[in-house]
């Protein structure tokens, strides 16, 4: 049903690969998010929470570099550990503090000086503009649904994103105490589509802003497009709602491997939530970003 649509949408949907590290963690944490392009001028949209992570990475990294610079000034003597403890208090570092975030835009543009971001004041929506690139590495751009009255309960739609990161082209440099991207390893993760039926609509202050689907949006699909069987874009995945079903099972005895075990289960229904196409188009118009529509 969505074969041709996925092929079409994949031409302008791209992953953002991220590698994170906590102060007390010994392993690097890979993650992915999704953006998709709306024109041939380097404009893309994604979730505001994704954009905030991208924007916040620089400050997080600068803060840790300042910490390292001060730490290097300590003499390696009996007072070293005590001095480092004081420095940790100064920078408010604890084992769970995020100290490094490295991001990599995959197959978007050749090079760039940076990006400009416009975040929606209330919705989980943001515009990203790639700056000073020479060549685009995406082949097409989104076509948004022109008449949103066609979106009705029971309509089957699809989302595309990168929820299961498999890239491993990064390493930890113990000498510099830093995360580094490498030329070795896997630089891409497979795209992952997931379908769902339109169940309800989301509104606030009598203003429609979202579409609810019968299946969850997965971690890493945030910022990815919601589209129909033609590849026409209806919205953008931004979160998943968890509804308690009330079918609770407490200490029920069942047979497991020829033995009796007690189990408990609390069931939830996981529903995807997407920003409505009309809200996206209104935000693009507000910032005078060119986009395209189709029936």
Predicted regions and their residues:
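C-terminal subregion of chymotrypsin/trypsin-like serine protease catalytic domains
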Residues: 44, 228, 232-295
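Catalytic histidine site
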Residues: 12-83, 131-133, 160, 227
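Flexible, gly/ser-rich surface segments that form the specificity/activation loops bordering the active-site cleft
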Residues: 142-209, 217-221, 237-251
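Conserved catalytic-core segment of clan PA serine endopeptidases
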Residues: 2-8, 27, 61-137, 146-148
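Conserved active-site neighborhood of the chymotrypsin/trypsin-like protease fold
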Residues: 42-54, 105-169, 207-208, 289-295
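Conserved hydrophobic positions within beta-strands
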Residues: 37, 112-116, 198, 226
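Mixed-charge, low-complexity intrinsically disordered segments
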Residues: 55-96, 169-183, 243-255
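Catalytic nucleophile loop of clan PA
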Residues: 36-37, 216-237
């Amino acid at each position: 049903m969505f074969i041709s649509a996925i092929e079409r949408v994949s031409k302008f949907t791209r992953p953002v690969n991220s590698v994170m590290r906590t102060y007390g963690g010994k392993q690097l944490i890979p993650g992915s998010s999704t953006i998709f392009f709306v024109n041939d001028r380097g404009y893309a949209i994604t979730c505001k929470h994704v954009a905030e992570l991208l924007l916040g990475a620089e400050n997080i990294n600068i803060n840790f570099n300042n910490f390292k610079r001060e730490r290097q000034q300590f003499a390696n003597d009996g007072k070293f550990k005590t001095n480092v403890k004081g420095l940790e208090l100064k920078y408010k570092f604890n084992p769970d503090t995020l100290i490094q975030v490295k991001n990599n835009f995959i197959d978007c543009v050749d090079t760039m000086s940076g990006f400009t971001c416009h975040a929606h004041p209330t919705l989980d929506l943001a515009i990203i503009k790639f700056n000073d690139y020479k060549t685009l590495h995406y082949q097409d751009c989104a076509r948004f649904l022109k008449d949103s009255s066609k979106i009705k309960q029971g309509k089957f739609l699809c989302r595309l994103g990168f929820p299961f990161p498999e890239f491993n082209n990064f390493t930890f440099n113990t000498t510099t105490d830093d995360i580094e991207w490498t030329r070795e390893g896997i630089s891409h993760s497979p795209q992952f589509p997931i379908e769902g039926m339109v169940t309800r609509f989301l509104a606030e202050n009598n203003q429609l802003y979202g579409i609810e689907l019968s299946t969850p949006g997965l971690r890493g699909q945030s910022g990815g497009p919601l589209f129909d069987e033609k590849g026409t874009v209806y919205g953008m995945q931004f979160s998943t709602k968890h509804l308690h079903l009330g079918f609770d099972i407490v200490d029920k005895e069942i047979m497991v491997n020829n033995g009796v075990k007690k189990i408990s289960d609390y069931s939830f229904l996981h529903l995807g939530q997407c920003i409505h196409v009309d809200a996206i188009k209104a935000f693009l118009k507000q910032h005078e970003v060119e986009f395209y529509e189709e029936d």
